[in-house]
Amino acid sequence: MIVRTTDEITGTHRDVAAANWRSKRIVLADDAVGFSFHETTIDADSVSEFHYRHHVEAVWIVEGTGTLTNHETGEEHPLRPGTMYLLNGHERHRVTCDTTMRMLCVFNPPVTGQEIHDETGAYPPAVQAS
């Protein structure tokens, strides 16, 4: 059994930040459970481009509002607490935040925790945790 709090993660290698977001990586590849689980916060009035070519991601919005844009279809979806979106087709997408958004994210395959988005908005293919 694994039990963790976000307080334990703050300031460790599991607490990853970029220009407009912060992700607390609660469950990672080295936990050996087949997925990773993150609490991610994206800043208000920001736009983020993502394209998880090597991962499937499920996202549950718990706080804030914004818009999800599917670049492949042009469809836009409002984001608010209680909304889930699943990127099961590796869709290139944009998240536009009207307010600070907090979300819970599940990745398969799991991430190691230190991945950085490349120029296309993707994480690299899954690698072994060190």
Swiss-Prot record:
Name used for this protein in its record: L-ectoine synthase
Keyword annotations of the record: Lyase
EC id: 4.2.1.108
Pathway named in the protein's UniProt entry: Amine and polyamine biosynthesis; ectoine biosynthesis; L-ectoine from L-aspartate 4-semialdehyde: step 3/3
GO biological process entries: ectoine biosynthetic process
Organism of provenance: Mycolicibacterium gilvum (strain PYR-GCK) (Mycobacterium gilvum (strain PYR-GCK))
Top EC class for this record: lyase
InterPro entries, per the entry: Ectoine_synth, RmlC-like_jellyroll, RmlC_Cupin_sf
Superkingdom as given in the UniProt entry: Bacteria
